[in-house]
Structures are given as structure tokens and as C-alpha cells.
Amino acid sequence: MYRSLEKSCDDFHLYIFAFDDKSCEILNKLKLQKATIISLKDFEDEKLLAIKPSRTKAEYCWTCTSSTILYVIEKYDVPSCTYLDADLYFYQDPKVLLDEMGDNSILLTEHRYPPKFNRTSSSGIYCVQFLTFVNDKNGMEALRWWRDACIDWCYNRYEDGKFGDQKYLDDWTTRYKGVHVLQHLGGGLASWNVEQYKFMERKGNRVLFFDKASNSKFEAVFYHFHHVRFFKNDIVDLGWRHPTMPVVNNLYAPYVVELQKNEEAVKQIDKDFNILLKDFTLINNDGLKNKIKYLLKVVFRYNVFNTKNLIAKNSGK
């Protein structure tokens, strides 16, 4: 994600929260010029540490989202802060998205689920993936409320109208002033909504889609590569949703190449670095739901690729 911003954006600075010591060590060794690396020991406060034992690793990461934004705004006195998921990849400068919010204080990004796959009721209207808060009265009021709410309850389950850190955002357009919902379709492309759009072409870093509903073209700003997972024997799983082969070949394959380049870069500065991959087997898929998904993928042979074959077929991209 950092490298994609380097290619597409002249002016940015990332505040990267390293959630384990090894990540912090490697990120500091990389000497990223436009990034500040923040360790857990510097970031965690008493409230976060108090609830940490009651959350899984994933739930704790979700719990911390609002706190990371608040930390950056207060610690570094920045005028605004945009939270980014680490599995985003940018194809053009996100300034076009930030400009859209105008004088508003908060920018939200919808999931944009298609009707046949609408999980709004359980997962939320908005996706915590690209989320901006301005350091003003309206922005900080919402941010502090969100942090307190996530510390009180943030779990990987639907309960009483809540789910993780996301469902809390559902009523913000009426709860708070200065909230803008992103309209640019190029911001928020992901496996759960890309089937609504037809891939048209990719020229370098310029990716063009066609929106069937509005009968119009738009350029991708970023894509959310949710649930891309690597396994032993050069296997990559692209997730549960089923993107078309043009999307796989023009977005996923180049993304896999970029991840492998970054792995090699890390190995250059840390000879002992090794990713402990699992076998792509039924036993390594936790829970009944994931086991069923695994069986479907094996039987119907979709979304699971050999990385070498995938890259070889798209070496000219």
C-alpha cells in the first residue's frame, strides 16, 4: 500500500501502527521516507490495555482503529487524518476523494453491496477502509464517541445492532454534522462490489471500469484486496467472492507480484525473515463456515491459484 501511494501520490505521510515487535523492527529498517512507525508500547493506553485480554487479535485491531486516528491527530497535531486498511492498493492520487468532501468534517465510504449480496444489515452500510476525520469540533466529537464505543464493545459478531467497529457508523449522517458519504465509485472497489462494474482496460497504473447502473465510466482510485491469503506450495486464495478473470488478471495478479517484491525487499534487510505459511487444507480453515467455503473452492476450483502460473500468464501487465 505504501509503495502504491509512492507511485500515485506526491504528497502524503503514513503513520503506521506496528502491532508486534518484529513488524516494528522491520518497518524501521525499511526507512520509509514518508512514514512514521509507531509501536504498540508507545500507542496503547490504560483503557486499551484493560480490554485487550477480552478481544481476539482481529477484534483488538478493530477496537484500536478509532484510537489510532485519535492518537495521530492529538500526538502530531495534524489538521486531518485518513485511516487506511493495510490491504488497499492505490491506482491514482486519493486527493480526488478528499477534495470531494469539501468543507465537511468526516468522510465515509460505503460497502456498495450489490442487491443479491447485500450484507448491510449485518456488516454495516459503511466500510472501515478509507475514513477521514478533520481536526475540528464535528470530527473530534464523532471520533471520541467512536473510540469510547469500541472500547466498550467491539467483537466479531452481530449483536444488538452492532458488528465490530463498523455498524457504529450507520447513523452518522443524522447523528453528526459535517458527514460526507463518498460518491466516487473508484474509491472503495472490493471483491464484494466489483461484480457490479465491468472491467474495461488497464494502461500502466490507470484502471478503467464501466458502471452498469449509471451507464458511465470511472477510474479506480483504490482497490481493497480483502482476504487475499497465501499458502504453502505457491497457492494464493483470492477470497470468497468471485471476481471475473479480467479483474483477476489485471488487478489481483499484479498485486500478488507487488507483494512478492516486497517480501524479497524485506529479506534483503532481514536474512532471518520467514513467512510461516500453512497448507491449503480443510484442517487449516477455522469454523464450519470457512470449512464449507474451502470445500466449495476445491470442488468448483475457483479463486485458488498457483502464484507462479498466475504471474506467468500476466507477466506483461
Model-derived segments and spans:
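Glycosyltransferase catalytic domains, chiefly GT-A lineage
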Residues: 1-317
